[in-house]
Amino acid sequence: TQFLRYQERIMSKAKEKKVGVIFGKFYPVHTGHINMIYEAFSKVDELHVIVCSDTERDLKLFYDSKMKRMPTVQDRLRWMQQIFKYQKNQIFIHHLVEDGIPSYPNGWQSWSEAVKTLFHEKHFEPSIVFSSELRFRSFVSRS
């Protein structure tokens, strides 16, 4: 019976775990992004950072920038993994491909389905969404 009570306590704590998620292009990642991620991480037990890519949008961002070389999705994922390597068991980096999804608000339904699929594939369900963009705030109430 003592073991069962212990197991119930562990299960109860697991249910209480705060899981956060942040979406961004991180094109390129900068100190504002890093500070936002650490601020979000300070409020949760586990944080999932979603690096969003869209081939056409990313190309336009590159042409409109002063970057000498276009960062690939792999570059952006590697930057994030490198920056948060000491928190790799608490801050998880994922990739969301947004190719073919119309921009907000027209692609809202397709985008939210892609996000839900990613959550399912990566086996997590966020209890809080952190974002500087208003469009993501409504995702919480619709999901």
Task: Place the predicted regions along the sequence by residue.
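Nucleotidyltransferase catalytic core that binds NTPs
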Residues: 3-143
